[in-house]
A protein has these predicted regions:
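ATP-binding pocket architecture of kinase catalytic cores
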Residues: 35-200, 204, 208-214
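Juxta-kinase regulatory segment immediately upstream of eukaryotic protein kinase catalytic domains
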Residues: 1-32, 36
Length: 215
């Protein structure tokens, strides 16, 4: 599936010590059985995703991007624990292998999970995927059905899930966080009119937040 999966050579700026990861996997009890082949998935703007293949395992490694990061963003431990907790009630989650919170291994936290084969949706579907109108409809309604299943899971039904919630305040945190990030990222050439329009939108969002509920 190499022409569909989109994994290619690891970008120089995103490379890491493969042997260090191999040694760490062995320490976690994963018998990798030989040399490790690492490739990087393109796209995405959050965390970096790699294919890690050995003679005995087909794995995925996730790590934060390099450079300056927003406070609280790219939390590998939280991402790992959410997926691990969803495995039993939801099912459509990869098996988690192990979480590394020791920056000394590759310079950042990371985690490894089993690979689940499938298509990574992008702006253009690959030529090998030829869907007629009926198939596209089934694909879209199927995706919606899965999202509905996911959002019907009660976080209080599992001790692992309930421990991950931050209670109320999700919308407020999002509005305040993204407004702050926008203000910090904008440059002098943005222009006064564009800044004023942006501030108007942010003020509207701040004033029209929906009623809060625990999440």
């Amino acid at each position: 599936m190499s022409d569909i999966e989109g994994a290619g050579e690891v970008r120089d700026e995103d490379a890491f010590d493969v042997e260090a990861v191999a040694a760490w996997l062995r320490e976690q009890g994963t018998d990798i059985g030989g040399p490790v082949d690492v490739r990087q998935f393109g796209g995405g703007a959050s965390n970096l995703t790699y294919s890690v293949r050995t003679p005995t395992h087909d794995l995925i490694l996730r790590r934060p991007p390099t450079g300056k990061k927003a406070r609280g963003a790219h939390d590998m431990g939280r991402e790992y624990r959410i997926q691990a907790a969803l495995k039993e009630p939801f099912g459509l989650v990869a098996d988690m292998v192990a979480l590394c919170q020791d920056d000394a291994v590759i310079g950042s936290e990371f985690y490894v999970m089993q690979r689940v084969d499938g298509l990574i949706p992008r702006r253009e579907l690959p030529p090998a995927v030829d869907l007629d109108e009926a198939a596209v409809r089934r694909l879209c309604t199927g995706a919606l059905d899965v999202l509905i299943r996911l959002h019907r899971i009660d976080p209080g039904s599992s001790a692992d899930l309930s421990a991950l919630g931050k209670g109320t305040g999700y919308v407020r945190r999002q509005v305040e966080g993204w407004s702050t990030r926008f203000r910090n990222a904008r440059t002098e050439d943005v222009g006064r009119q564009r800044i004023e329009r942006s501030e108007t939108v942010m003020a509207w969002l701040d004033a029209h937040q929906p009623d809060d509920v625990a999440n």
